[in-house]
Amino acid sequence: MPGDKVIMKSGEWKSQFIHFKGKGTAEKPITLTAETKGSVLLTGNSNLKIDGEWLVVDGLSFKNGFSLKDDVVVFTKTTTNSRLTNTSIENYNPVDKTLDYKWVSLYGHHNRVDHCSITGKNHQGTTLVVWLDDKPNYHQIDHNYFGPRPELGANGGETIRIGTSAFSMNDSYRTVQNNIFDKCDGEVEIISIKSGFNKILNNLFYECAGTVTFRHGNNSEVSNNYFIANNVTNSGGVRIIGENQKVYGNYLYKVAGRTLRSAISVMNAYEKPALNDYWQVKNADIQNNIIVGAREAFVLGSGKDNDRTLAPDGVNISNNYIINPTTLLVTQDEPKNLKMQNNQVEGASIVTGFVKMGNDLQMSDGIWQKKTEIKKPFWLATAIGPEWKKDHRSFIFK
């Protein structure tokens, strides 16, 4: 009934298959919670299915086990306005690393995953997937800690995927905000955007060997994120594919990758792409980013080969700040309708579209920031992950 609370007794719950089903209301959600947050340990082959409306799951811990085949936590296709919060999934790995299951699967619409810790996935399958159909889902993923994920050595090691190739021309309206991605090295795509109208806002990507990739779909935005790469091998920034993508206000520090893993990579495309191929970049807008110590700050027409022959059309690179790059600009294929203006650079030769660095920037909290827009990085001012899991993490600039 609306307002009901189901309290799980503290201790180990081994191989539990929990089907949390109900219909709450906005004013009176139904809650499944731990007697003491973090003290309910779901071990063995436990799984959780969230199935209904206005449901809240709070304070659980999955550890010392693995799933036999099903995803660990699933929001069902009919689930709406429901929430997974203050919960941990840690090292929930099978012996067989080729076994594919996701740790969180989001179906339905208007659901939220927040203040969780999801760390240590080392087997096949994306960590968290938003599954799309022909309608927008408006999910929200915020204030989570996504901990280290080692390189998988195959496709399917993303930390987050939004959509699938089959529905990539549909819109998701999904927000990923105020999360920490710490050494998420599963594959080249840390976040793989495969749908339209998504926002990746104000996240920290710390020493990750990968990129945030506009893989399929159009009209998405990656803005005000922090990529603190510290020259880690294969670290990357943002990879652009598709139409009307926006890359604004990001801070990229010592990104060591090249071409597809450069600080900002604008890709070439197939002339007649299938849904799962590389679509032409059109009207990319890249502004107000601060790039410090990158191996390659910008790569245009990246990935050009015998198949990817179609250059970007309409690329605006304006009002960015680039400090001490190894290489400022690489052009693998010349975009049509390229606009580059008012970009300020220090520590590299001036080329068309770039001018000598002025005095717009100021160092604050170890980060170069615009003097008119000084702010404290969110992870220094906001609680991330479960309230009961006191991890002493520090994210330093090297």
UniProtKB/Swiss-Prot annotation:
**Molecular function as annotated in GO:** poly(beta-D-mannuronate) lyase activity
Spans traversing the lipid bilayer: none
What are the alphabetically sorted keywords of the record?
Answer: Lyase, Signal
Name the catalysed reactions. Eliminative cleavage of alginate to give oligosaccharides with 4-deoxy-alpha-L-erythro-hex-4-enuronosyl groups at their non-reducing ends and beta-D-mannuronate at their reducing end
The answer to whether the entry has keyword Lyase is: yes
EC?
4.2.2.3
Enzyme class per UniProt:
lyase
- Record's Pfam families? Chondroitinas_B
Name the family. Belongs to the polysaccharide lyase 6 family.
Q: What is the protein name stated in its UniProt record?
A: Alginate lyase
Naturally occurring in which organism (per UniProt):
Pseudomonas sp. (strain OS-ALG-9)
Q: State the organism's lineage.
A: Bacteria, Pseudomonadati, Pseudomonadota
Primary gene name: aly
